[in-house]
Each structure stands twice: as structure tokens, then as C-alpha cells.
């Protein structure tokens, strides 16, 4: 049976969010954003959930100490790297080495700060990957007018047709073996895991969701 395993990279600094503390550890309603994200995923269908933070992170250690008891099935891995792709690579390779994941399993990579994920979207994404038998990601259709600037100045070069444009979101779901293969290659310039899988020539399905799933980019939104 193909299992569904969630991987949450939580080693980022969240510089765009502002403040000294990484945004996944900042509070909403008295709890860290990561807590709310885990609360959503932990109620869903996942056989295993892994949170990956930095070994020397005080915030990661404090979160584990304070909230681990709320999520007894969640496993915290101190394997975080400097970049997101480093964190995901180290975690995926570790899970394979420890026989915690196998090539046929589905690996879900979900941003720690995307705490607005809805169960209906998880279920839809699960249905799509199981029916199509290949990778898929959540994505929001671009609805704003998009302008491209000149390379060296803030002057409009052209207006981009938005009909086929989507904003990549998470979760991003992959056959574990495909993701591991993608992470073995050149990760330079890769914005997300889907981009790495694209480089392999593998199909990645888009599952359209609303803008309400977008991350929290600035501190004045909470």
C-alpha cells in the first residue's frame, strides 16, 4: 500500500516576515504558526508527519519541548540546512536510509507557515495523485494583471497574459522515489520541489485552490 507521508521544512528564517524570530514560530491566537499548521495536518489522513528544523535552533528546540505532547505522532528531525532544498534533501535521504519511506510512497512537502490549509484541498490533492499516479501541487490561478519590467529600470516592458499562469503553493506531492531522484541533481536556482521534478521531465499536476491559502509574508497581517 502506498502511504501518505508529510514533510514540513521548518528551518527557514522567514526574513520577509520581519522580526528576529522565524515566522513559523511567531504567534497567532497565542500559538506558533507551526502549531496551527500541524493541527490541520494531524487531523488528516497522513500515516506519518515529520517536522524538520535546525539542530542549533533555539526556537525549534523550544517548540518541540512545549508542543510535542499535542502531536504524539509527529516526529521532529534536527536536519535543517541553510536553504529549503537542503532541508528537504537531507530529510528525504534520511527517511530512505532509515527505511521510513519507500519509493512507491507519496511524500507531501508543506510549508510550515501555510497554516490556512483546508481538509477539502488535502482530500482533492490526494485523489488527484492517486488517480493520475504522478506528482501534483496546489496552485492559485493568477487573477491580477501582471507587468514585466525592463531589466534595468522600473518601466513596463510588457503585460503578461495571465490565462495560463498559476502561483505555486503547498502541499506539493511526489512519488518518494521521484523526489529523491530530483534532489540528487543540480538544485541551483530551484524555487521549489516541483521545479526539480520538472527538470526530470516528470509531469506535475496543478490543483487549483483559492488565494486564501497564501502564506503570511509580512508581520502586519497577523
Where are these regions (language model features)?
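Conserved core of the sugar-phosphate nucleotidyltransferase
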Residues: 116-207
